[in-house]
Amino acid sequence: MGPSDPDDDGRVDEAVVVGGGAAGLCLAHRLTGAGVGVTLVEAPDGPLRPAERTWCFWEAGTGEFEEAVVANWRRLRVRGPDGHVVESDPAPLRYRMVRSGAFERLVHSRLEASPTARVLRATAHEVRDAPDGAQVHCTTPDGRPLALRGRYVFDSRPVRATPPHRTLLLQHFRGWFVRTSAPVFDPEVADLMDFRVPQPRHGLAFGYVLPLAPDRALVEYTEFSRSPLTTSAYESALRHYTTKVLRLGPLTVESAEQGVIPMTDAVFPRRTGPAVFRIGAAGGATRPATGYTFAAVQRQSRAIAAALGRGRAIVPPPYGRRAMAMDAVLLRALDTGRVDGPRFFTDLFRRVPMDRVLRFLDDGSTPWEEFGIGLRTPVGPMLRTALELPFLSRRTTGRSEESPR
């Protein structure tokens, strides 16, 4: 079924998925494929419905969501503050871009073909346990209350506040989709990090360039720091980057996107009740050291669907303990200024094969590979930070904002 009129008809689904972002769509798709009855609750049109977003990830071969991939790149590049270039083909991996609108249309078309799936437009207010499952209390677009029931509920809505943590940085960015008057981009190469931009007093900043054609690209200015900028400050940084650094010449900004992604060593609870689970960024699927989320969401969705198909409900951790420990050390080292961010990332990609770095960031590396990666970082500052972390208390700060990349 496609998006349908809400009707509290006494239906009890095996699963209710709250939120129609990457995590909710992926899980609804996986559950439907596993033969699990599912209702996907999406926000109605209006201020609660998120704007078009860009999600990127790397993958080998052809994925099952290839129809929603708008571009992919065979070669990846990192530029140091001095212009030093590290460029590599991380075969068999390719870097891919998905636009949220295309992804939503693709998943909706697949859900429409299933008699066990439905998509409801409603505003979810409360999720709570109930006898033999859980309930989602909603309001329909015309203002009527609606209670949805499921044996299990998977909630992807952003958490109200970041859980207790020792370190919290924000990855915040604004990007322009630009069209230039001359063919200035190489569609085969994506710039993951370009540190030739002025660096902030605290944290780090870089450019991010994803060419879509010789004369079109997504160009972003990104910072890892404690506070986001104003829109005018992002615009100024983008003007400087496109004119003074990239020297793109005359261009037209066709659209823009902006977001904030928490980078933290907080532990996000994945189960909040006997039948209620958190998924996606709300369930810890954002990689703390990078802000990437989409690939982990897919892994998590596959595992949940496989477990439910066997009659069990689990939401596995998106990343292993070693990866989380290494990320916690890096975040603290960046936040304290013990390591120079631009130099750290430039040297990491220069000293470690790019395919190995990407596998590590996707939680696919071996302990020996991770040991080797650790030896190619500033050992002294990182070791000092690792020894300090167990003695630091976790604290709670303000609201968590999420716009996963």
Show which residues each predicted segment covers.
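Predominantly flavin-linked oxidoreductase catalytic cores and closely associated redox partners
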Residues: 30, 110-251, 264-267
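FAD-binding beta-loop-beta segment adjacent to the flavin cofactor pocket
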Residues: 198-204, 259-278, 333-339, 346-350
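C-terminal helical "tail/cap" subdomain of flavin- and related membrane-associated enzymes
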Residues: 302-405
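N-terminal Rossmann-like FAD-binding beta1-loop-alpha1 element of flavoenzymes
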Residues: 5-40
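Short FAD-binding loop at a beta-strand-to-alpha-helix junction that anchors the flavin cofactor
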Residues: 209, 271-289
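N-terminal FAD cofactor-binding segment of flavoenzymes
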Residues: 30-83, 102
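Short hydrophobic core segments
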Residues: 16-18, 41, 147-160, 276-281
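Flavin-binding catalytic cores
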Residues: 227-257, 277, 299-320
